[in-house]
Amino acid sequence: MARSPFSPHWHSVAALKPRLMAYAVIRRMVFRGKPWYSVQDQAGGKVYRFSLAAYELIAAMDGHTTVHSLWERANSTASRDACTQPEVVDLLMQLHGANLLQTDSPPDSAASLEKQRKKRWETPRQWLLNPMSLKIPLLNPDAFLTRYADYLSWCFGPIGMLLWLVVVMPAAFLAVQNWDVLTHNLSDQVFSSSNLLVMMLVYPIVKLLHELGHGVATKHWGGAVRELGLMFLIFAPVPYVEVSSSSAIVSKYRRAVVAAAGMLTEIFLAALALYVWLLVEPGVARAVAFNVMVISGVSTLVVNGNPLLRYDGYYILADLIEIPNLAQRGQAWWTYLLDRYGFGAHEAVRPDETTAESRWLTAYTPLAWCYRTFVTLGMIFLIANQYFVIGVVLALSLIHI
């Protein structure tokens, strides 16, 4: 069923004279030969993506022209499909919700206070709704990363690549040669009570370096890193950095490097840890090195590096195949397929995907679901084999995540 080009709410926005905030920056990007435009909030670092039709409206917002005039002008001059009134209303709401829009109307004090109140209670509300996955912002690392990003810029050139290969490649051969020793009775080694204490101390440090890798790469290509904090996944502290501004980087290969920077950092750490593990006698240093290898190796191969899970590998794949929001679009595509062909809903609206995109979406979503289920159940059974109660708690908690 086609959507009406007219909106019952048009009267509330038609007379507004909007313009973008001064800290909003527009960039042109190309995905699969089709132009898109990103609007980056330089104050907060977030990036929003819009179609060509939406961009033509946004670019014409000068603070003097009414929304109705902008819409009429777009419909009278556009050779392509212009935005409908409901789409314009949605666009204005999205820009307003992101604090990117300024209008000629005086601010509503009550509405502003209500918005601040909702924002203040947003984090506690998320904690109450999902106590197994808490996110606590701690500080703004942008100034720190800006100060040191220039000193580390060589890491993203030939010298950095050569150093990484010189350290990692020999370590890979040594790992193969010592594989039996490294993996002997692995689960008992990892889940022993003494090793778990060491792992709890090592894990946050390794993951902090992982996240700083993303942050330095983002700063190297002109992005902003406005937030560093702790995310408690099933009560385990995991550092994170907010690098959504990297999605405004025009080159898809540079965006992919930003997504891969954390894994490259961990692999480098794992290689150094292997050398330490081979050189020192059994003791604290060897235990720490072993845990660095386990954390970096397992997380890279099984979790972060796999595009079927929504971690680093996922963003690398989405950037390289030029399908942003791959998971969400895959879910929308499969919802359409099930509605249209499974339940015979002939009025189901087909998502606006090309033939090549629909092939990726058709394959990706079921593969991701199967792999995610396999990894989740495998981890639960592995932990439950050593600590039954913890395994049960993990299984129950995943129902809520």
Q: Across the structure, where does each feature detected by a protein language model lie?
A:
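Eukaryotic partner-binding/assembly regions in large regulatory complexes
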Residues: 1-26
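Long, charge-rich, low-complexity alpha-helical segments
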Residues: 2-9, 32-36, 42-155
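Membrane-interface and transmembrane segments of multi-pass membrane proteins
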Residues: 103-164, 224, 231-232, 313, ...
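Core alpha-helical transmembrane segments of integral membrane proteins
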Residues: 122-228, 272-277, 283-286, 294
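Select subsegments of transmembrane alpha-helices in polytopic membrane proteins
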Residues: 158-165, 258-267, 360-372
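Membrane-embedded catalytic scaffold of the fatty acid hydroxylase/desaturase
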Residues: 191-357
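Transmembrane helix-loop junctions at the membrane interface of multipass transporters and ion channels
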Residues: 271-286, 370-392
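Conserved small/polar residues in nucleotide/adenosyl-binding loops
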Residues: 399-401
